[in-house]
Every structure is written in structure tokens, then in C-alpha cells.
Amino acid sequence: MTLNGVYHIAKIGDIIYSLPAVYLRGGTKYYKIKREGVCEYLKPLLEAQPYIGRVEYSSNGNDCELDFSNYQALYKLYLRGNLTYMHLVCAGIRAHHFPLKISKLSLESEHLSYGNVEIDLNTHRDTLIWSDEKPWLTNIEPKHVADIIINITDRYHDWKNLGSKEHDFRSFDYTLCKDYDCGFIGLDNEYQLFVDRYKFEPKFIRVSDALETAQIIKGSKLFVGNASSAKAIAEGMKHPTLMEISKTYPDCIPMHKHGYHFISKELVEHY
């Protein structure tokens, strides 16, 4: 049965990772998003999905049947590895192959709590399982701009500020892409940081919304990047992906047969 509303308080990528749970719960008549800018960016992409009605900005989800505010509780409890599965748990769907790992809580019963948020694990719908190979972003026309689309943010790269002696990304070498037709999607400052760090200049691509981002990624042969909204879109389409992950916080591990959490010349050439 179609949900009477879904509400989310988080950022672009988190909302994209929530969509399999929305799909398995029967879709929704409307999806409300707390952040206005995030809402406007995502609206064309989300409304293109057959299981989502309208998308709108709202400061609260009081009238929504499914509220993902408790998603933050799972994140803080260190249920890490895949954000899609974390949303499935929030929606009362047991992710059978999600390793439920809790490092900051002694789980005495099938019940989680964090602050004023409570999640009853007994409500899981065991018959609902999401296939790792099933795309949840569809109805997207490919738009070819470059063979390889790159998007990285400075997320986890501020290692000096975090008191770390080592940068746990050093083994991921973006320069392996430099001899190919590459485009970079992202903010101006992200592009400049990339150029300064890796010493080559892919074409800079500006986009108007998430739907255009999806079209450009789908029109490419390969997506290369880190934990970002563009990576979430690539994951939602099950597009070939080489992903730079944090060994400390591996939140967005690719979960399909064309997703890799390392880069090599052989993989770049293969795609």
C-alpha cells in the first residue's frame, strides 16, 4: 500500500539512499524534505521515479507515515557499511545481508534507542528484501559529456584537522584517469582542490539539478569518486563505479557487481 508521506531531515545522498526503503514500502504519495535547497535540487530526479508522487519542502513531517529522522540514530550508533541498509532498518525492513554491527551499545533486546529516538527491531518485515543489483533510480535519459565522470568532495580529506597521522586515501590514485576523456561534476572549490591535488584538469561540468547529474553519469562509461551525492546517484542507477572509501568510516561501499572500492589501470581501461 502506498505510503501517506515520507519525511527526511538529511542531505542529498542520504535521501537518495532512502529510496529502496520507500519503494519496498509501496512508494509514497509525497516526499517532504527539511532542507529547502536540497529539496529543489532533488525534486526533478525524485519526481521522475514512478513510486514517488510530489516532492516538497517542509520544516516537519507530522503528517508523514514514514519519518527518517531516526536514521541519524543508526548512524551515531555506528551501524556502518551501507546507507541503503540503514534506511531499510529505519523503515522496519530487515536487511538480511547487512552486518548489524553496534560498537557503542550493548544490545540486550531487539530494540535500539538513541536519545529520544527508538527503533523496534521486532517490526521488521522479513519478506521484503532489496537486491543489490536492482537500480532504484530509473526513467533517466543518458547525456554524454565525458567517458569518465569524476566527483570528489573534501569529505574525510581534512585528516590533519582530525588529528590523524596518516591519510587513509593515499592508495587511491585519480591520476590513473588523466589520459582518458574525463569530466568533473561538483562545486567550483571542489574542482580547484582536485586540480591542485592531482595535477590534471578534467573538463568542469556545471549542473542545474540532480536529474541532470544522473543523466550525465548515465551517459558516461564510468563514475569515479568518493562519498558524495553524485556517488549516491551512480549507486542508485547501478552504474560502473570506482570508489574511494575511508578505511575509518566506510559508509558508502558500492553494492553491485560493477562497483569497486579501489582503482587500477586495468579497471579504468576495462570500462
Q: What is the predicted function of each stretch?
A:
Residues 1-271:
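Catalytic machinery of carbohydrate-active enzymes
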